[in-house]
C-alpha cells in the first residue's frame, strides 16, 4: 500500500480485495481449470465495477480497459473469462484495441498485477480442511458485518452484493 499515495487509492484497493473475498474468488475449487492471469483479469473486471467513487490506481483493469470488446456490466467471472480467452486466441482482427491491452497486461510482472497463484482449494486433505475453515469464518464475518450495519444503510449496498449476502444468511 506504500505506493498508493492517495487515500482514495488505498480505499479502492482495500475494497477491491474485500470484494474478491465476498465473491469468494480465492476459494474457487475449479481455479486450476483456468489460465491464471486471465482468471485474475476476469475476477478484477467483476470486482472493480463495485468500487464506486473511489479511485482505482493507474493501470487497474476495468471494463474500459477493453473498449472494443463489448463487455457488459454485471456479468460473471466465467462470462468475462470466456470473452478474454476468445480475445487472446483471435482478437487482433475483431477487437484490436482490446487485444493490445490484453497483450500488455499479460506481459506485466505478477508483482504489479498481484499474485493469486495460491487461490483455490489446496490439493492436500489438510489444505482442503483449512480452506473450508477459512471460508466458513469468512461467511461468519460477512454475516456479522451485515447484522452490525444499520438497516437504513442497506440500500446503499449494490443489489448483486446484497443477493450474495442474503444467500450466505440463508445457508
Give the location of each predicted region:
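Active-site metal-coordination segments of metallo-dependent hydrolases
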Residues: 32-44
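Active-site recognition of the HExxH zinc-binding catalytic motif
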Residues: 9-27
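Poly-acidic low-complexity segments
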Residues: 24-25, 35, 130, 171
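Short pre-active-site segment immediately N-terminal to the catalytic Zn-binding motif
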Residues: 1-13, 38
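Negatively charged
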Residues: 49-171
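Amphipathic alpha-helical interaction segments
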Residues: 21, 25-30, 54, 58
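Glycine-/proline-rich flexible loop or hinge segments
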Residues: 1-4, 25-33
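An amphipathic, basic-hydrophobic helix/alpha-beta surface used to engage anionic
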Residues: 2, 18, 43-53, 171
Amino acid at each position: 500500500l506504500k505506493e498508493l499515495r492517495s487515500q482514495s487509492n488505498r480505499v479502492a484497493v482495500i475494497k477491491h480485495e474485500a470484494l474478491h473475498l465476498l465473491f469468494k474468488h480465492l476459494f474457487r475449487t475449479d481455479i486450476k481449470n483456468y489460465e491464471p492471469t486471465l482468471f485474475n483479469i476476469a475476477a478484477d473486471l467483476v470486482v472493480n465495477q463495485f468500487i464506486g467513487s473511489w479511485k482505482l490506481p493507474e493501470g487497474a483493469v476495468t471494463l474500459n480497459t477493453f473498449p472494443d470488446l463489448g463487455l457488459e456490466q454485471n456479468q460473471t467471472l466465467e462470462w468475462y473469462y470466456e470473452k478474454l480467452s476468445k480475445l487472446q486466441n483471435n482478437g487482433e482482427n475483431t477487437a484490436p484495441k482490446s487485444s493490445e491491452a490484453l497483450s500488455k497486461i499479460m506481459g506485466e510482472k505478477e508483482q504489479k498485477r498481484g499474485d493469486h497463484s495460491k487461490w483455490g482449494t489446496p490439493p492436500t486433505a489438510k489444505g482442503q480442511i483449512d480452506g473450508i475453515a477459512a471460508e466458513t469464518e469468512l461467511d461468519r464475518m460477512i454475516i456479522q458485518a451485515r447484522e452490525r450495519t444499520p438497516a437504513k444503510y442497506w440500500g446503499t449496498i449494490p443489489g448483486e452484493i446484497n443477493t450474495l449476502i442474503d444467500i450466505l444468511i440463508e445457508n
